[in-house]
Regions:
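Iron-associated oxidoreductase/ferritin-like identity signal
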Residues: 1-135
Length: 135
């Protein structure tokens, strides 16, 4: 996603997606560290290549928003399971991750709303790009 925007000289969008990807790597590391601290092994399976082509900025942002929403749902399911089995330690671990994930989902919803409102008008897209560059 970063590359898709970078190739189109939309540096604000590109920067936002680069930052998001680094955040996701940090979360993955936290999960691995947590599992290791609990005496578990971390098994990394092959990850299929991500989607790399979209018809429009709106399609890409919509795809990203749906990924964020799915991740939020998965984290909430994990939390529910740990709550049901009285695994307080896992709940405490998940609390800040779920908070950050919810904020990320909200941010993508906001960006998606702006992109939809812009209706592929180049000047409006450039304003959104500029706004993202400032963050």
């Amino acid at each position: 996603m970063y590359l898709w925007f970078q190739e189109r000289d939309l540096n604000g969008f590109a920067s936002h997606f680069l930052s998001e990807s680094l955040g996701e790597m940090e979360h993955a590391q936290k999960f691995a560290d947590y599992l290791i601290a609990r005496g578990q092994s971390v098994k990394l399976d092959e990850i299929p290549a991500p989607v790399q082509t979209w018809d429009s900025i709106e399609d890409l942002i919509s795809y990203s928003f749906n990924m964020e929403a799915d991740l939020t749902s998965s984290l909430q399911q994990l939390y529910s399971i740990s709550e049901r089995i009285s695994d307080t330690r896992t709940n405490v671990f998940l609390d800040p991750i779920i908070d950050a994930q919810t904020k990320s989902e909200d941010e993508f919803a906001n960006i998606l709303g702006k992109v939809k409102f812009a209706s592929n008008q180049p000047s409006a897209i450039l304003l959104i790009d500029s706004d993202l560059k400032k963050k």
